[in-house]
């Protein structure tokens, strides 16, 4: 595993904090911009990242009726980001429309389907969402739905990676946010694994946020992570 397979979550509320963090970590080449930062800073953060030669995972998790999802994906594609998320539970029509719309674009983002948030475990899936399937079966079903609709990949926890790699094949991108180094706390994610294990299981990229960005010394935390990956 190499640092190029690590996407660092830029989970800060505004542009000045985001730029300060990016400039403190010049070795990070791939950043995730989520709802908090995109709403707080607007698309200018994407321009700032591109000006610095960074790759961008725009994690806005679109979930709406098919035509609205289509329009949102087309609007987001103008930013020329690398990865863009949408919920698989929007259904096959919405997913297919989005995938077909990206195909003719000169610089389309890879579309990733959200299968199930990594904060949700079996009990919540069963009792709160009233879903009788176990987490791994539900995630597998959502990933198959996305693949069959022409979506490029999926976001899933590391526990589901190996099964999805078998089910969806080698070309299907798998990005997992539920990873944390051994030296960090698990936070609010329930389905976690260390980065190297997730890659070995078949993930293309891992997403790591607070273990790096919330550390008193993000530079030292990033260096420690890179040392872990080299072992």
UniProtKB/Swiss-Prot annotation:
Disulfide bonds: none annotated. The keyword Translocase does not apply. It holds the Pfam family OMPdecase. InterPro entries: Aldolase_TIM, OMPdecase, OMPdecase_AS, OMPdecase_bac, OMPdeCOase_dom, RibuloseP-bd_barrel. Its EC number is 4.1.1.23. Keywords: Decarboxylase, Lyase, Pyrimidine biosynthesis. Substrate binds at residues 11, 32, 59-68, 118, 180, 189, 209-210. It catalyses: orotidine 5'-phosphate + H(+) = UMP + CO2. Pathway: Pyrimidine metabolism; UMP biosynthesis via de novo pathway; UMP from orotate: step 2/2. The keyword Transmembrane helix does not apply. GO terms for biological process: 'de novo' pyrimidine nucleobase biosynthetic process; 'de novo' UMP biosynthetic process. Homodimer. Catalyzes the decarboxylation of orotidine 5'-monophosphate (OMP) to uridine 5'-monophosphate (UMP). HAMAP family: OMPdecase_type1_B. Belongs to the OMP decarboxylase family. Type 1 subfamily. This is Orotidine 5'-phosphate decarboxylase. It comes from Synechocystis sp. (strain ATCC 27184 / PCC 6803 / Kazusa). The gene is pyrF.
């Amino acid at each position: 595993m190499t640092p190029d397979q690590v996407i660092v979550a830029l989970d800060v509320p505004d542009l000045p904090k985001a730029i300060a963090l990016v400039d403190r970590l010049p070795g990070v080449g791939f950043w995730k911009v989520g709802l908090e930062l995109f709403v707080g800073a607007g698309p200018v953060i994407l321009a700032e990242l591109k000006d610095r030669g960074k790759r961008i995972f725009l994690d806005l998790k679109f979930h709406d009726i098919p035509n609205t999802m289509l329009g949102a994906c087309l609007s987001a594609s103008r930013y020329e980001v690398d990865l863009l998320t949408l919920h698989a539970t929007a259904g096959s029509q919405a997913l297919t429309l989005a995938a077909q719309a990206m195909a003719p674009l000169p610089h389309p983002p890879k579309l990733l389907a959200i299968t199930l948030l990594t904060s949700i475990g079996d009990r919540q899936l069963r009792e709160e969402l009233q879903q009788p399937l176990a987490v791994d079966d539900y995630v597998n079903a959502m990933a198959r739905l996305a693949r069959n609709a022409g979506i490029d990949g999926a976001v899933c926890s590391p526990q589901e990676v190996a099964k999805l790699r078998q089910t969806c094949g080698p070309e299907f991108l798998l990005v997992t946010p539920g990873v944390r180094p051994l030296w960090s706390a698990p936070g609010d994610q329930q389905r976690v694994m260390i980065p190297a294990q997730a890659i070995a299981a078949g993930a293309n990229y891992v997403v790591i946020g607070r273990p790096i960005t919330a550390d008193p010394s993000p530079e030292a935390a990033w260096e420690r992570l890179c040392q872990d990956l080299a072992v």
